[in-house]
Amino acid sequence: RLLRDRLAAGPVSLAVDIETTFHRGESRMLVAEFPGAARPDERVVLVAHVQEPGANDDASGCGTLLAAVLAMRQAIAAGAVAPPDRTITVLWGDEIRGSQHWLDADPARAAGVIAMMSLDMTGENTALTGGTFLIEKGPDPSAVHDRPSDPHTEWGAGEVDPAWVRGHYLNDLHLGVCLREARDTGWVVRTNPYEGGSDHTSFTRAGVPALLNWHFTDRYYHTNLDTPDKTSPEEMGHVARAVATTALFLGSVGPVDREPLLALVREAERARLETERRNAASEEILEAWRTWYAQARASVEALR
């Protein structure tokens, strides 16, 4: 009542002291797996983080990942696809710390990871939130060389260890899957250079080919206005289908897939070099891309 009376009389300024404490506690992680039928010690890992309280960040990522898992389970149970040769491991936990703990807890297990995808803010109703769906690529030369054809998001460029910039087919494979999903639906798919800040960071630092599925920029990001009315089931469906498709392909990719994968990577290399030449890239940048794509082709040729 006193505060109401003061407010009725005019503007009121408040000074507030808040006492807080920090303490250690347990952090739980939910782990689900599709056991590998032929190479169970080799793994594809999918991750969404649970600790952010927003609807898009990251309830939508957790829900999208669950939808992808249920779709894979249904397809395998129905005989539409074969069980994966490799184990597909699914993690819901604390962002970055949870992923790092999973990697550190069993180095032998971590050594078997062939690829990882993170799902973060995957359910945006972009008409309300702004931004678009993005694939944040595993580190390639665009993470080091700022180019007009490959701009960073408002999140901003992060520090990149040169050792992380190693070519792999994962970027172009997942982009191709997403573009196929978009072909008949009008889904907007774009990419951005590696920036870090979600669960793919832990795996990238560990030398694992990794990428992020997300949306940015979101005008409600990290505010109490990140609410369910700003999510889109259709957008979550697009991401879930693309992630499930890529994960199942990675789960059994082998020598029989070399030629189509090589064709995909070669076409991506051709398009990239053409774009960089058109934008007057230096010879240093062109050579960086040639090197990266040579490594990406080698990652395909190494399939066994």
Q: Residue spans of the language-model regions?
A:
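Sec-exported extracytoplasmic/periplasmic mature domains
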Residues: 4-8, 70-77, 104-108, 179-183, ...
